Amino acid sequence: MQQWLEIGKVVAAQGLRGEVRVQPATDFAERLTRPGARLVGRSLDDGRVFRLQSGRAIPGKDLFVCRFEGVEERNAAEKLVGSTLWIGAAERPVLAAGEFWLPDLMGVRVFRQDTGEAIGEVSDMTRAGNDLLVIRLSGGKTVMVPFVHALVPVVDLEAGRIEVVAIPGLLDPEAAEADEA
């Protein structure tokens, strides 16, 4: 079964010739500019495959203008507003060593490197100065750990294991709550 990755949302029709404005949900602009198959729909179940003919960034805005085969006029484009765009997972660019796809990290078990104790699992990632892994601890609370090699030296996706260096306060949700107060 084909796996799909979300790459954007159709937010508006653009002009009279069937183009749409897309809010990107990807760091790879070529996913919205390079021709090829894209799944477009309100959900994966009702999505329809369209061929992206062309796409371009709108200077100064976090938007792209895309043209799909078979969408030739504004009324057809307006029917796509609110839809999500997906690309086949097999079309993901090759990453350098030490780089990972967020969907591949989700749900991976996290362990303290010093004791080997399982402490929780990755539930999300957020961006600040650098990426922060959001780890749902076994007790239900969450902590954020900078996703840098010094603190997260082991990421073994095949084994489903991430190891974290437990410096004082890093894995203590109460310390994080005290900092927020």
From Swiss-Prot:
Cellular location(s): Cytoplasm
Domain annotation PRC barrel: ranges: 97-170
Gene3D superfamilies, per database record: PRC-barrel domain, RimM
Keyword Cytoplasm carried by entry: yes
Disulfide bond entries: none
Signal sequence extent: none
Comment on protein domains: The PRC barrel domain binds ribosomal protein uS19.
Similarity field: Belongs to the RimM family.
Chain's role: An accessory protein needed during the final step in the assembly of 30S ribosomal subunit, possibly for assembly of the head region. Essential for efficient processing of 16S rRNA. May be needed both before and after RbfA during the maturation of 16S rRNA. It has affinity for free ribosomal 30S subunits but not for 70S ribosomes.
Name of the protein this chain belongs to: Ribosome maturation factor RimM
Organism: Gloeobacter violaceus (strain ATCC 29082 / PCC 7421)
Gene: rimM
